[in-house]
Amino acid sequence: MKATTIIGIAGGSGSGKTTVTNEIMKNLEGHSVALLAQDYYYKDQKHLTFDERLETNYDHPFAFDNDLLIENLKDLKNGKAVEVPTYDYASHTRSDITIDFKPKDVIIVEGIFALENKVLRDMMDVKIYVDTDADLRILRRLTRDTKERGRSMDSVINQYLSVVRPMHDQFIEPTKKYADIIIPEGGSNKVAIDIMTTKIQSLVSKQ
């Protein structure tokens, strides 16, 4: 059985992780590739009241069920299909709906804390950090949350200043040191993305 290549992509909210992920997937034609988003693995909060769930800090590592993510990745590397959880943002807890996820040649683990957990890092063949200026990240987050999630500009800015930025500085930015590849300017850095995808193509072909 062909070995599974696991690629980790981390970076702050709005850094361009999705763009980088899409470029990798586009450049790995001929291989089966799938995204395993860390956002799928927010912890189940059904034991909490709705008001208690509203207090959840989604920008803290504790919000994620890394044990389940690691277990799922181990099974996938061993050729076993898994049921991946999904999250219901309206009720602020895990959904009853799961995704049937089959083993692939390449699995991309993408999320703000993709490089924060050592056990998870050690499972990765390539670790990438998408590094983007803070001003650009907040502008992207403003656009996304106001247009796609119906939030007011004030609420997004307040959350950024009180939670997102402090959590980024404390937990996300320090994980940059674990990256094999750092992509400055995020998804707009075509030269870095081309070099990175060429390296990944070579690695996957050898597996």
Curated annotation (Swiss-Prot):
Q: Which GO terms describe its biological process?
A: CTP salvage; UMP salvage
Q: What is its main location?
A: cytoplasm
Q: Which SUPFAM superfamilies match?
A: P-loop containing nucleoside triphosphate hydrolases (SSF52540)
Q: Which InterPro entries match?
A: P-loop_NTPase, PRK/URK, Uridine_kinase, Uridine_kinase-like
What metabolic or biological pathway is this protein involved in? Pyrimidine metabolism; CTP biosynthesis via salvage pathway; CTP from cytidine: step 1/3; Pyrimidine metabolism; UMP biosynthesis via salvage pathway; UMP from uridine: step 1/1
> Keywords for this entry?
ATP-binding, Cytoplasm, Kinase, Nucleotide-binding, Transferase
What subcellular compartments does it reside in? Cytoplasm
A single GO molecular function, which one? cytidine kinase activity
HAMAP family, A to Z:
Uridine_kinase
Spell out the protein name for this chain: Uridine kinase
Give the encoding gene's name. Answer: udk
